[in-house]
Amino acid sequence: MPKNIPLSQTISITAIASVSPLGNESDTIWTNYQNPNTCFQTRFLDHKDTLVAPLDADSKEQIDALRQSDSKYKFLDNSVLYAMLASRKAIAKAGWTTNDIFGINVGSSRGATDLFEQHFQEYITTGKAQTLASPTTTLGNISSWIAHDLQSSGPEISHSITCSTALHAILNGVAWLRSGMADKFLVGGSEAPLTDFTIAQMRALKIYSRSEEEYPNRALDLDKTQNTMILGEGAGVCCLEIGKKENALAFIEGIGYATEILEHNISISAEADC
């Protein structure tokens, strides 16, 4: 059953930041939103040319610079680096510093899939696993590295709720703030799923786009006769604070959640009811 819960105290969203194919700065993102052209590119994945939406050139440069900024960062998955860059931008906008105590909950659905696939392929080939294979591919990898990068001393949580991961991070952040156990929380999600195995999984589900039209992703076309999903990559985070803040971009005044009774292993019904 869905639950709608009024908040006893308003939560302020004091900053939002993202890294995606649309860019990583507000002006660039808005300009690309207004561009009628897509951000799709063709990559050879899962043994064939595949449309995907990778990061824009500027974001890739910033990610590369971040990767080179610390010797430990060279071994991290892109999903971690995307979240780290977005988190840096968010707390800068919110005015948070290392003196602030804030929690972190940034999750991921696919997790460190690119790095995991590389490590698994090496194991299949050599029969040996690298020392860093486990610590760099665990689910807790994202929030813990963000905490390290931002020198945060608050609680850090990682989780995966399939397609609702980032929204559940907001729910978790609100719960922590309402409980009085934190005054500030950094929440969001990160995905870097443009890999052979991930694309193969989406094709096995029959949901990946096979269209060669000008707009191959028909997300708003309710009359389409086939699935047209195209994977992208990126991270989005926001800064939450308890109470009404003067610098708030928006306020959270209510939250909700629901649990679905599954009819099928891949969470679909016979008539595709939502």
Where are these regions (language model features)?
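Acidic, glycine-rich active-site loops and adjacent beta-strand->loop/helix elements
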Residues: 19, 108-111, 161-165, 189-194, ...
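Cytochrome P450 core scaffold surrounding the K-helix E-X-X-R motif
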Residues: 22-24
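Condensing-enzyme catalytic core mediating Claisen C-C bond formation in acyl metabolism
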Residues: 5-16, 26-27, 31-50, 213-274
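A glycine- and small-aliphatic-rich helix-loop capping segment at beta-alpha/alpha-beta transitions
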Residues: 27-31, 117-129, 146, 176-179, ...
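Short glycine-aspartate micro-motif
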Residues: 10-13, 101-105, 182-187, 219, ...
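Active-site-proximal alpha-helical scaffold in enzymes
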Residues: 83-93, 139-142, 147-150, 155-191, ...
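Conserved beta-ketoacyl condensing-enzyme motif
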Residues: 13, 37-160, 193-198
